[in-house]
Amino acid sequence: MKLEIENAVFEYLKKTLNRDLSAMLVRGHSTTLRPVTYIVVDCSEPKPFGTLSAADGLFELVLEIRIADSAHDIDYRIQQKRVNAVFKALENFECSADGISVLSFEFELDSDARDDDNIGDVLKYSVIAQI
């Protein structure tokens, strides 16, 4: 389910964002695979919702969208435009993964992020999905 939701969000952003932002989307979690500037979709492992068991088929996940640029020459006005565009695009997200129904897709927070020589934002969403 993790990979299916990651892929669904990735493909949704790929078709929804403008060409420049869409070109920044990368797959994978290794920093060596990421060109700067980048946008990465990362989903946590699903865990059964509340006190339910996995057999009940209702899961909660955390989805993070990382939007980063070089810490050496980031333009924060442009970075904020990127963040706003991704946030706006996800307002109407509907999961297209077969056999998975996203029941709730709620924005939780925007925080800063740093890795290697990059700096940026993380948009965090709470996801409840059913299989």
Regions found by a protein language model. Name each.
Residues 24-36:
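Short secondary-structure junction/hinge motifs that connect adjacent elements
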Residues 34-44:
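Charged, often glycine-rich, active-site loop that binds/positions anionic groups
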Residues 1-22, 29, 43-131:
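Charged, amphipathic alpha-helical segments and their flanking helix caps
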